Amino acid sequence: MTYLLVDGENVDATLGLSVLGHRPSPEQRPRWERVRSFVAEWGVPVKALFFLNASRGELPASFVQALMAMEFRPIPLSGDAQEKVVDIGIQRTLDAVAERPGNVVLLSHDADFVPQLKALLTDGRRVAVVGFPEFVSTRIKALTSDGLEIIDVETQVGAFNAPLPRVRIIPIDDFDPAPYL
């Protein structure tokens, strides 16, 4: 089993604030079915969980239905305004996954999950963080020496319909000047 956990708030905020510079339109958001398909290529069944902040008492019904149609299990969490309910929910889920066999893929850039990720890396399972590597927390990046994989949601997963306006470090061996001319 591979557990796919999506920090919906974090992915949306990083895409909007750091990559696009504005709130993403539906066409600019990741194609979640591609993310799930990418993870399924690991060759084991996927349990896909999508964490949502529902603290305002609202649930985006059409989005929830779309997630369910793509075989994601929406997990709408609520709490006090100052509580990071999505982070708490993901932390608890990662702790629970540590008690059972299975790989883990987390879509987030957030350092709040470092203790749980570190614990998961100690028993030989495959663990990855998917996102925009240039925005992944340096504390998460430090776990690559323990075996954590960092996977680019755009270039490796192919989760977007059009190229994003990203500025990132390009290894010289990968540099092609044509797109810049």
Predicted regions and their residues:
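Domain-level signal for Mg2+-assisted phosphodiester chemistry and nucleotide/NA-binding surfaces
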Residues: 1-84, 126
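Nuclease catalytic cores that cleave nucleic-acid phosphodiester bonds
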Residues: 56-181
